[in-house]
Amino acid sequence: MTGMDITTQDELNEAAMRDRASRDEERALRLGWWLVLAGFGGFLLWALLAPLDKGVAVQGNVVVSGNRKVIQHMQGGIVDRIQVKDGDRVAAGQVLLTLNAVDARTTSEGLGSQYDQLIAREARLLAEQRNQSSLAATPRLTQARQRPEMAAIIALQEDLLRSRQQSLKLEIDGVRASIDGLETSLGALQKVMSSKQSEQATLSQQLQGLRPLAADNYVPRNKMLETERLFAQVSGELAQTSGEVGRTRRDIQQQKLRIAQRQQEYDKEVNSELSDVQAKLNEVISQREKADFNLANVQVRAPVAGTVVDMKIFTEGGVIAPGQVMMDIVPEDQPLLVDGRIPVEMVDKVWSGLPVELQFTAFSQSTTPRVPGTVTLLSADRLVDEKDGTPYYGLRIQVSEEGKRSLHGLEIKPGMPVQGFVRTGERSFINYLFKPLMDRMHLALTEE
């Protein structure tokens, strides 16, 4: 093979290689374009059909259901013992601190003694009013009889009841004895009066017979005159006796009236005293209830289970003013809530019941899952931030039980920052890109 043949063969091989490379490059270019078109088509298909969550971003903070419980005392007083400190977990009803009880106990016992005296007096006056021989069995006295200290009080009032009733009885019996004497005198006077009336009638008949005879001188005139004198004397005695009978009857009526008046005065006195005692008793009952309430509340107790925070009382023997805040309790085992804010222009997109995804930014974002929750409250009117004057609408989100479990025991404290996303629906990526443009279309080409 000559040198020229070798050169020609090499050129042919080189041309074939260039042709093969050109075809490979064209094939790769076509494949690349097909891949680009397929990717773009797939992207368009995804952008048109794939659902994306739409919603409103929320910034908020963790709060406790019912908020922190402020511990105060209505009356105040002197601190006897402090039984908790900041950070202590307390049960509902646990004693937090105890106030000095001397003043409250003294007041309660004094009012209790007054109460015992008054209910015994009330029972005695009711017995006098009803003319009973023993104290009236009022519900208050029946209940109080069980206490040993009531025995002496009841005995004193029973003695007073008997004494007053006996005094009244003796007074009335004395008047009745006078009436009996007057009635005896009245009986005697009535007999005398009857005798005088008979004697007067006899003398009258004698005069009727003597006057005609004396006129005809059949009998001496002196006998007629003597009979007339006797008649006049008897008539005078009869009139006198009749007057005494009338006076005696009036005396009897006056004595009976005296008894009625004395009984009326006694009843009036009893009723007046009973009214005063019952009014005082009602007042003492009211004061005693207040005193017993104060005594029962010398021990300040936790209203709910939770953690003691923000202690303000540290000195045993110190003085607490009425209504002074002593500490707060953050409730535990309460629903986990988040107070958030949304811009005012987003208020029409959020309502109660919408699902929310929450992220607690205080924890590691790589290990802490998004926590599900639900919008439970949206403020009825817009609010304004006191610091910068920014308007907003407030909403409250409750973390679901599933969301609590997903935290795997992480301690959530009030005040922790939270980022949230309120899911209001779904939309495509194309809708997301073109919605702002579509929202402005009605304003396009209308400006002067």
From Swiss-Prot:
Protein name stated in the entry: Proteases secretion protein PrtE
NCBIfam families in the cross-refs: type_I_hlyD (TIGR01843)
Membrane topology annotation: Single-pass membrane protein
A Pfam family matched in the record: HlyD_3
Database matches in PROSITE patterns: HLYD_FAMILY
Organism, scientific name: Dickeya chrysanthemi (Pectobacterium chrysanthemi)
Transmembrane stretches, start-end: 31-50
Family from the record: Belongs to the membrane fusion protein (MFP) (TC 8.A.1) family.
GO CC terms of this entry: plasma membrane
